C-alpha cells in the first residue's frame, strides 16, 4: 500500500482517533493533509451517481445483489509513477513514503474509483 519514496513532493501526516462502529474502541488512523495538492489538481468531472438515479435504474428488477467495498479506494492501484510520487508524505522518524493505491483525501479519488467500478 505504501513504499519508501524519493519524491520531490511531501505532505504532512498525523494521527487522529475514531470510534469503531458498534464497539467501544477508539482506533488510531493516519491522515495525510493533501489540501495544497488538491488546490492545484484539476477536478475530474466523471459523474457520480445519486441515490434517485440508482433507484430509477433498479425499477422492475427481480434480483438484487450487494457488494461491500470496504476501503474501496485502497483496492485501486495508482498506475503512474508520477501520480504515486504526488502522494508522498513525511512521517516522523519513518521518512518519506508514497502510496501505491488511491489514498483517502485525494481530490479525484471518488471520481477515479467510480470510473473503475463502472
Model-predicted segments: where are they?
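Retroelement reverse transcriptase polymerase core
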Residues: 1-118
Amino acid at each position: 500500500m505504501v513504499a519508501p519514496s524519493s519524491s520531490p513532493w511531501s505532505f504532512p501526516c498525523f494521527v487522529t482517533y475514531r470510534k469503531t462502529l458498534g464497539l467501544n474502541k477508539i482506533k488510531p488512523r493516519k491522515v495525510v493533509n493533501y489540501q495544497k495538492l488538491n488546490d492545484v489538481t484539476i477536478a475530474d468531472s466523471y459523474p457520480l451517481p445519486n441515490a434517485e438515479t440508482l433507484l430509477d435504474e433498479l425499477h422492475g428488477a427481480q434480483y438484487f445483489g450487494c457488494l461491500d467495498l470496504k476501503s474501496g479506494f485502497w483496492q485501486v492501484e495508482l498506475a503512474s509513477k508520477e501520480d504515486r510520487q504526488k502522494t508522498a508524505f513525511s512521517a516522523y522518524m519513518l521518512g518519506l513514503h508514497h502510496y501505491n493505491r488511491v489514498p483517502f483525501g485525494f481530490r479525484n479519488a471518488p471520481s477515479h474509483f467510480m470510473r473503475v467500478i463502472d
